[in-house]
Design a protein with these regions (language model features):
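One-carbon transfer enzymes
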Residues: 1-193
Length: 193
């Protein structure tokens, strides 16, 4: 059976992309077929090229027509460190087939401007005892779509944004491939949610 075609949207280095590339062996129900970035210098594009995956840098990430053209025939869209808001028209084209990974336990520490180090700084400043990672469906707002899966990460005494980020990222690298594989099986059976 043909694997589910996965398009990755990324703005940074692409470590979650690499986790997916490593997890999706030829027997997997999904394959990364393209990587699209809001930044032409994103490390994710280099990772894609090294893996033989099509890599596209958007000229205008807010342009729905450009993004839809770049997504092409994707069956599943995965936001992995993508910091731009996906245009409404694009979200509407992928109902139940567009997901995001976020480095906190949503709904806490999500929304506009809450990405990367800022999330971990906010978690530590709040005194929270636990952080974690969330995979959720994408809707028209940052980090507000229905939650698919979460995995907690305890905050340790003496944690810094960097130490917490490293432990959360390790969890993201396990959680995202697992969810993508589960969704790919569901898509192959005709249901996404």
């Amino acid at each position: 059976m043909t694997p589910v075609r996965v398009a990755i949207l990324a703005s940074g280095g692409g470590s979650n992309l690499q986790a997916l590339l490593d997890a999706l062996d030829p027997s997997a129900p999904a394959a990364v077929t393209r990587v699209i970035s809001s930044r032409p210098d994103a490390g994710a594009l280099d990772r894609a090229r090294r893996a033989g995956v099509a890599a596209v840098a958007l000229r205008d990430p807010a342009n729905p027509a450009e993004l839809l053209a770049a997504l092409g025939d994707a069956d599943l869209v995965v936001l992995a460190g993508y910091v731009k808001l996906v245009p409404r028209e694009v979200v509407a084209r992928f109902p139940g087939r567009m997901i995001n990974i976020h480095p906190a336990l949503l709904p806490a520490f999500g929304g506009p401007g809450m990405y990367g180090r800022r999330v971990h700084e906010a978690v530590l400043a709040s005194g929270a005892a636990v952080s974690g990672a969330t995979v959720h469906y994408v809707d028209e707002q940052y980090d507000r779509g229905p939650i698919i899966a979460q995995q907690p990460v305890p905050v340790q005494p003496g944690d810094t944004p960097d130490t917490l980020a490293a432990r959360v990222l390790a969890v993201e690298h396990e959680l995202l491939p697992r969810v993508v594989i589960e969704l790919a099986w569901k898509l192959r059976q005709g249901s996404a949610r």
